[in-house]
Amino acid sequence: MKKKDPIAEARRYVDNARKALNENGDLDLETKLYQDEKYVRAAGNYLWLGVLMALDAVFHVRKDRRTRVDINNYLEAVGKRDIKLLNYVNSGYDVMHLSMNYDGIPAKEVSDSGFRLANAIIDRCEMMLA
């Protein structure tokens, strides 16, 4: 069985997040707020999972798929190699995981920031793998 490219898979998660918001998020153009926080939460979850997939491809923090890894393990591994990426991951955790996934903040600016950070992290991980 051919192993999947983790960066391509991470980008697929970002596409799924975009699709979840665009097709179901019901954006109010006047207020720039999504009307259904369920899809904001789903998009945040997809984005964060894609980011973790890209980070694991570079840093191999998660040794076993069945075990949970604390965010601090990722931050420690990233901080040893790339401070700029560490800043992206810290911000990404706050935006994608906490603000979007847990809090379901419906502001389009928050979601746009999540997509921008996810793409920046994945791009940086891809560069590190090259």
Spans of features found by a protein language model:
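Terminal alpha-helical segments
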Residues: 1-130
